[in-house]
């Protein structure tokens, strides 16, 4: 009988740890959703509808680029280094600048 009590306690401990893990994961997901919603509100304030649509298109194709671009746009706007609202042409120029900084050139010698 003593062995059965030990197994019950062990199972209860496993359940408790699993529940804590699920709760932590749910909380992290909730925080991520809140942060994404706050970014979206900020982007709606600093981008024209056309520029926001372009950013949404980028997000579909390259989500990691869109996230980096969002952070950069919010930083540029909050520091006053770019005129708000950012229109589609300005967004294109920012994208070109990012692309030229991150693009690697490969040269082959024959």
Swiss-Prot record:
List the InterPro entries hit by this protein, alphabetically. Answer: DNA_bind_arc (IPR022889), PDCD5-like (IPR002836), PDCD5-like_sf (IPR036883)
| The keyword Oxidoreductase appears for this protein | no
Question: Which GO molecular-function terms appear in the entry?
Answer: DNA binding
Q: According to its UniProt record, what is one Pfam family this protein matches?
A: dsDNA_bind
Q: What keywords are assigned to this protein?
A: DNA-binding
Q: Identify the domain of life.
A: Archaea
Entry keyword annotation includes Signal:
no
A single GO cellular-component term from the record reads:
cytosol
Family the entry assigns: Belongs to the PDCD5 family.
Q: What NCBIfam families does its record include? A: PRK04239.1
What's the protein here called? DNA-binding protein Pisl_0441
Q: Which organism is it from?
A: Pyrobaculum islandicum (strain DSM 4184 / JCM 9189 / GEO3)
Q: What is the lineage of its organism?
A: Archaea, Thermoproteota, Thermoprotei, Thermoproteales, Thermoproteaceae
